[in-house]
C-alpha cells in the first residue's frame, strides 16, 4: 500500500472504537505474536500501571503511518481508553529515526505525528496520568543504522 492508502485505512480505524479483529480470529504468525505480546502488556499494566512498561519504541520509523499503526494495535489489545475528548493510547508511542533518509524526514514525520488529533489527545491524557506540568513526547535518534547506512561522517553530520 502507498503511504496515502495506509493513512486512509488507519484514520478510519482510529475513528472507531470497535475491534478490528476478535480475540480468537486466526491471524498470521507474526500478527499473533505481536498481539499476544500487547495483550500481555495490557494485563501487566492493568495490574501494575503504565509506568511499568515505559514507551512503545517504533524502530525504523519511516512515516506517520508507522506510528499510527501502533495506536490501532494498542486499541486491539485494550491499551487505549475512551475519554471525553475521544480515544487515547495509555502508553507513549516513540519514533526511532535510524537511517539518514529517516533522519532527514524526521521533522516532517514529527510535525505530522504531533499535530495528529489522536497523538494530541494521548499526550494530554499521559500528562494527566503522570501529573506532569507539561506535555512530553520522546523521540529517539539512532546512530548505528545511520552509520551503516551512510558511513561515519554522513551519520554524524545528519545526527548533528
Model-identified regions with their sequence ranges:
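Active-site capping/gating regions of soluble enzymes
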Residues: 41-46, 68-85, 94, 98-160
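Phosphate/oxyanion-binding active-site loops and adjacent basic polyanion-contact surfaces
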Residues: 26-37, 59-69, 106, 159
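Extended, charge-enriched "interface" segments that sit outside catalytic cores
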Residues: 1-47
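Glycine- and acidic
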Residues: 17-29, 48-60, 88-97, 144-157
Amino acid at each position: 500500500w502507498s503511504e496515502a492508502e495506509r493513512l486512509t485505512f488507519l484514520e478510519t480505524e482510529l475513528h472507531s472504537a470497535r475491534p478490528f479483529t476478535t480475540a480468537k480470529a486466526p491471524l498470521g504468525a507474526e500478527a499473533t505474536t505481536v498481539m499476544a505480546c500487547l495483550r500481555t502488556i495490557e494485563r501487566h499494566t492493568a495490574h501494575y500501571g503504565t509506568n511499568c512498561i515505559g514507551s512503545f519504541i517504533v524502530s525504523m520509523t519511516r512515516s506517520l503511518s508507522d506510528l499510527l499503526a501502533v495506536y490501532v494495535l494498542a486499541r486491539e489489545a485494550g491499551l487505549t481508553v475512551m475519554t471525553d475528548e475521544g480515544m487515547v493510547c495509555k502508553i507513549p508511542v516513540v519514533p526511532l529515526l535510524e537511517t539518514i533518509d529517516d533522519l532527514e524526514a524526521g521533522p516532517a514525520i514529527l510535525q505530522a505525528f504531533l499535530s495528529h488529533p489522536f497523538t494530541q489527545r494521548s499526550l494530554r491524557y499521559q500528562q494527566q496520568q503522570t501529573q506532569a506540568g507539561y506535555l512530553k513526547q520522546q523521540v529517539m535518534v539512532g546512530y548505528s543504522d545511520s552509520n551503516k547506512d551512510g558511513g561515519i561522517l554522513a551519520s554524524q553530520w545528519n545526527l548533528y
